[in-house]
UniProtKB/Swiss-Prot annotation:
<feature type="compositionally biased region" description="Polar residues">
    <location>
        <begin position="178"/>
        <end position="196"/>
    </location>
</feature>
<dbReference type="GO" id="GO:0005576">
    <property type="term" value="C:extracellular region"/>
</dbReference>
<feature type="compositionally biased region" description="Low complexity">
    <location>
        <begin position="155"/>
        <end position="170"/>
    </location>
</feature>
<keyword id="KW-0964">Secreted</keyword>
<dbReference type="GO" id="GO:0042803">
    <property type="term" value="F:protein homodimerization activity"/>
</dbReference>
<protein>
    <recommendedName>
        <fullName>Corneodesmosin</fullName>
    </recommendedName>
</protein>
<dbReference type="InterPro" id="IPR026087">
    <property type="entry name" value="Corneodesmosin"/>
</dbReference>
<comment type="function">
    <text>Important for the epidermal barrier integrity.</text>
</comment>
<feature type="region of interest" description="Disordered">
    <location>
        <begin position="140"/>
        <end position="225"/>
    </location>
</feature>
<dbReference type="GO" id="GO:0098609">
    <property type="term" value="P:cell-cell adhesion"/>
</dbReference>
<dbReference type="GO" id="GO:0043589">
    <property type="term" value="P:skin morphogenesis"/>
</dbReference>
<feature type="compositionally biased region" description="Low complexity">
    <location>
        <begin position="202"/>
        <end position="211"/>
    </location>
</feature>
């Protein structure tokens, strides 16, 4: 479909605030637009509740589906491994939230991908977050060196944006490795927040296979790793 407008912030309810454009021009399948924000279809605001029999409200891009089914059929992060040993848990508080693709300064990783600022993402070293990450201002972000400058994203898989360490449904949170991690210095992913696979009823369920690999010679070359 068409590209989404820039995502400027993520609120505590998990919606994406956008600037410019119209809902008709920027909606992609599976997303809905309301009050200047984009939501997965089936996620409705307090101001726009679902009324009467199940169906598509006037502002929806399609029929309602569960958030779990939406994210399991539209994976945000590629699954590189089915082994839970490749998922590193961390007790660190700061986090980078992996969000659906937007065009707000996020570029594909690789040669020539430079210019944008954000959580540092260096070639071969994964993602390094900073305690000064801000979700609303670029002044706290620092650019990366070498080939890729963050935030960056493999084409079609998503984008990185600074946010809080909220574990609400649909978000994949990469945390810096800490004392509890088995691979200090590499991106970590909280197993409890790996909710990409829909359960029998479509509700999000932990999916250890949607984890991050340690960076190095065995890495697939994609970020996150």
């Amino acid at each position: 479909g068409k590209p989404c407008p820039p995502i400027t912030s993520v609120d505590k309810f998990g919606s994406y605030e956008v600037v410019g454009g119209s809902s008709d021009s920027y909606l992609v399948p599976g997303m809905t637009y309301s009050g200047g924000k984009i939501y997965p279809v089936g996620y409705f605001t307090k101001d726009n509740p679902v009324k009467g029999s199940p169906g598509a409200p006037s502002f929806a891009a399609g029929p309602p589906i569960s958030e779990g089914k939406y994210f399991s059929s539209n994976p945000i992060i590629p699954s590189h491994s089915s082994s839970s040993s490749n998922i590193y848990q961390s007790g660190a508080s700061s986090a980078i939230v992996f969000q659906p693709v937007g065009s707000g300064g996020v570029q594909p990783c690789g040669v020539g991908s430079s210019g944008s600022k954000g959580p540092c993402s260096l070639s071969g070293s994964g993602v390094h977050s900073s305690s000064s990450i801000s979700s609303s201002s670029g002044s706290s972000f620092h650019p990366c060196g070498t080939v890729s400058q963050g935030p960056c994203s493999p084409p079609g898989t998503g984008s990185f944006s600074g946010s809080s360490s909220s574990k609400s449904g649909g978000k994949i949170i990469l945390q810096p490795c800490g004392s509890k991690s088995s691979s200090s210095g590499h991106p970590c992913i909280s197993v409890s927040s790996s909710t990409l696979s829909g359960g029998p009823d479509g509700s999000p369920q932990p999916d250890p296979s949607a984890g991050a690999k340690p960076c190095g010679s065995g890495s697939s070359g994609k970020i996150p790793c």
